[in-house]
Amino acid sequence: MTGPTTDADAAVPRRVLIAEDEALIRMDLAEMLREEGYEIVGEAGDGQEAVELAELHKPDLVIMDVKMPRRDGIDAASEIASKRIAPIVVLTAFSQRDLVERARDAGAMAYLVKPFSISDLIPAIELAVSRFREITALEGEVATLSERLETRKLVERAKGLLQTKHGMTEPDAFKWIQRAAMDRRTTMKRVAEVVLETLGTPKDT
């Protein structure tokens, strides 16, 4: 069981909220996740219910359909993301791919196009969780929006170099930067700057 766990909490399954207005799809998705060891803490049939359940249960992840009654998935995702409750994976039909950019702007961390299999779903979940942790960690380090954007840009470039030059995965590269900052009692921004300087890539002017 590799999908729902992390090194730190290997025995604890991820807690998932599912928001999907089609009952059969919602049931299939819940069964699929339970078989992989995830815990389903709530099931919502519309966007408003999804927001309410997210605030109530504080899940580790929200899987949200884009098109839902009462309140669409993008609007609901925007509120959940703005409150930093949990990372969000959005589900969209092939014909709705134009909505993916809107979903990303709303704060979704990953998306899947229906129909999908469990082999598609697990990587999307892990990507969403990883990105959410990065953003949360970076926001805890810097106060202003402009500083956050600058720091994220530097960290993204440093991660790219670590992936290219040292063969790290994206999550491993971020963990390396985060751990280096903690070990040296400095900021992730400073570590990213050192990585860029050391690997010979000039900083932006």
Curated annotation (Swiss-Prot):
Contains a C-terminal ANTAR domain, which is a RNA binding domain. Keywords: Acetylation, Cytoplasm, Phosphoprotein, Stress response, Transcription, Transcription antitermination, Transcription regulation, Two-component regulatory system. This is Transcriptional regulatory protein PdtaR. One of its GO terms (biological process) is transcription antitermination. The modification N-acetylthreonine is found at residue 2. Signal peptide: none annotated. The NO arm of the pathway is further controlled by sequestration of PdtaR by PPE1-5', controlled by the Rip1 intramembrane protease. PPE1-5' directly inhibits PdtaR and derepresses PdtaR targets, which are usually repressed by the PdtaR/PdtaS cascade. Monomer. Dimer; when bound to its cognate DNA. It is found in: Cytoplasm. The modification 4-aspartylphosphate is found at residue 65. Member of the two-component regulatory system PdtaR/PdtaS. This two-component system plays an essential role in mycobacterial adaptation to poor nutrient conditions. PdtaR probably acts at the level of transcriptional antitermination rather than transcriptional initiation. In addition, the PdtaR/PdtaS two-component system controls copper and nitric oxide (NO) resistance downstream of the intramembrane protease Rip1. This coupled Rip1/PdtaS/PdtaR circuit controls NO resistance and acute lung infection in mice by relieving PdtaR/PdtaS-mediated repression of isonitrile chalkophore biosynthesis. Two signals are required to fully inactivate the PdtaR/PdtaS system and mediate NO resistance: a cytoplasmic inhibitory signal through the PdtaS kinase mediated by direct sensing of NO and the production of PPE1-5', an NO-induced small RNA, to sequester PdtaR. Its main location: cytoplasm.
